């Protein structure tokens, strides 16, 4: 599945070679105020219901984005919008589970990652939960602007010693935050704001892409392609050539075309 809007954005999501289904979900859309949202969700493949979780969470955020004007909003107001929508997403997952639990009790742990960026005027507001990523790209660098919510990074934040980190060697990539139906758990997400005019491209992607590509290649691959659609196709192909075994999803925004 892919979508494009001329020279502004391109999106691609495809099933990995050893996956039974594509549990990723992506959206690139405008709201009624002319602002743009790019979103990627990666449903947890280890649990039943990952595909439905990513689709439902994407739907909730898309609906909420459509009616909210981000222009001239304070950081606090934008964060409040995200928190309210995240709570609604949790509630939606719980409601869905209640309708099917009699026959699908294994859906109890359905969950997804989430990364989204909203572009309004010259601001790029980025939120994330889990390990789907966002990169800002220009000719000088590909800057990862998200930090994976996993055990390794949590241990680093706790200033754990190398020996302690090594003791968790088989669990370091375990996620420490996801979007699930667990409404009792404290909200955990991260946020940052960047400016459009310092960058050429914004890339959001799932780990099926970034785990198998060197980010330093992003700019050359994108700018060597004749258009954005070919660029996302080439990035996906390169990750497969490098033995990606996961679902691959990416949204690419041409910030030079943003006015």
Swiss-Prot record:
Domain PPM-type phosphatase: 8-255
Alphabetized UniProt keyword annotations: Hydrolase, Protein phosphatase
EC class: hydrolase
SMART domains: PP2Cc (SM00332)
EC numbers for this chain: 3.1.3.16
Substrates-to-products reaction catalysed: O-phospho-L-seryl-[protein] + H2O = L-seryl-[protein] + phosphate; O-phospho-L-threonyl-[protein] + H2O = L-threonyl-[protein] + phosphate
InterPro entries xrefs: PP2C, PPM-type-like_dom_sf, PPM-type_phosphatase-like_dom
Single GO term (MF): protein serine/threonine phosphatase activity
Domain of life assignment: Bacteria
Membrane-spanning intervals of the chain: none
Name used for this protein in its record: Putative protein phosphatase
Provenance organism: Mycoplasma pneumoniae (strain ATCC 29342 / M129 / Subtype 1)
